[in-house]
């Protein structure tokens, strides 16, 4: 009886600790928090990132800022 209760408690605690990982992974594939505390929007929980590509590059850009 004691062993099963301890197992259930350990399972619940481990699930609650890993609950935030899938949500962070959905937001741009980033799991680790950015350095700035203001980098995540508290209402939408999405990470704010600035785009370095020019606006006319719809498919993204290379490192030298040329469109793909």
From Swiss-Prot:
The organs and tissues expressing this protein are described as: Expressed by the venom duct.
| Entry keywords, A to Z | Disulfide bond, Secreted, Signal, Toxin
Q: How is it modified after translation?
A: Contains 2 disulfide bonds.
The protein's location, in the record's own words, is: Secreted
Recorded GO cellular component terms are: extracellular region
Stretch forming the signal peptide: 1-20
Going by the entry's taxonomy, the superkingdom of the source organism is recorded as Eukaryota
Q: Name one GO molecular function term.
A: toxin activity
Q: What residue ranges constitute the propeptide?
A: 21-50
Show the domain comment: The cysteine framework is C-C.
The family classification in the record reads: Belongs to the conotoxin L superfamily.
Protein name per Swiss-Prot or TrEMBL: Conotoxin ba14a
Q: Which organism is it from?
A: Conus bayani
